[in-house]
């Protein structure tokens, strides 16, 4: 755990060092919000955030479209019944990641190494704990949550199966949002979007394979989403741990 967060800190420090040396320019992946035109920098930084939120919703949308076409209306209802709660969870953890990013950006900009290290460690550990708690709660409480949401009885079994498999991947989307928050806090909002677009494509391909070709059922659509979310989280973690800021 400390080794992982230490590598993340090392990445941030490499960015900081090159920033201090003035070796970074506008063609690089990092957007320096303190230099150049304010409006242009805001647009360049904010557009990936907007499209990132859009593509995060594409997971459930793709599941609904593919399941509805291959498995029928009941299966579509089973997937769609969880859409609002998934939207709420994504928004909630996006907010937490943004809050953590503000703290990290502050210490990064002030060059307070010790506080930056603590903030990164706390963000990573908190994300893992939240993911595990959410996974456990989802596995246990999925049927009751769906009943509270007034899910029709005829689709409740399939909806519960989808929901439980989706919650198994809670750790992936929580960590993804945390890693994105760290990257964005040092000015890189584009690479998380690239990874999310790629993982969305992976999700669609796996949906078609699991549901359309192998006929595994509604739960397999959730499994496709979980796999693709782990892909996006792993790509973000790889960039934080191993890639140079200029890559």
Map each language-model feature to its residues:
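Hydrophobic transmembrane alpha-helices of multi-pass small-molecule transporters
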Residues: 88-91, 203-207, 233-237
């Amino acid at each position: 755990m400390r080794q992982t967060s230490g590598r993340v800190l090392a990445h941030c420090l490499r960015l900081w060092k090159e920033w201090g040396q003035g070796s970074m320019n506008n063609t690089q992946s990092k957007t320096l919000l303190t230099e150049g035109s304010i409006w242009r920098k805001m647009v360049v930084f904010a557009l990936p955030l907007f499209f990132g939120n859009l593509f995060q919703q594409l997971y459930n949308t793709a599941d609904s479209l593919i399941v509805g076409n291959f498995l029928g209306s009941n299966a579509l209802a089973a997937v769609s019944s969880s859409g609002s709660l998934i939207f709420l969870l994504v928004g909630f953890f996006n907010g937490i990641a943004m809050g953590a990013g503000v703290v990290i950006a502050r210490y990064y900009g002030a060059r307070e190494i010790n506080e930056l290290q603590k903030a990164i460690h706390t963000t990573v550990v908190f994300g893992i704990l939240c993911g595990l708690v959410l996974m456990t709660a989802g596995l246990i409480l999925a049927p009751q949550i769906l009943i509270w949401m007034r899910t029709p009885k005829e689709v409740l079994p399939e909806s519960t199966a989808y929901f439980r498999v989706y919650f198994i991947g809670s750790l992936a989307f929580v960590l993804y949002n945390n890693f994105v928050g760290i990257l964005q806090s040092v000015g890189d909002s584009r690479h998380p979007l690239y990874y999310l677009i790629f993982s969305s494509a992976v999700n669609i391909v796996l949906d078609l394979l699991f549901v359309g070709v192998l006929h595994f059922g509604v739960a397999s659509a959730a499994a496709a989403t979980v796999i693709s979310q782990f892909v996006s989280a792993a790509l973000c973690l790889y960039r934080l741990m191993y890639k140079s800021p200029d890559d």
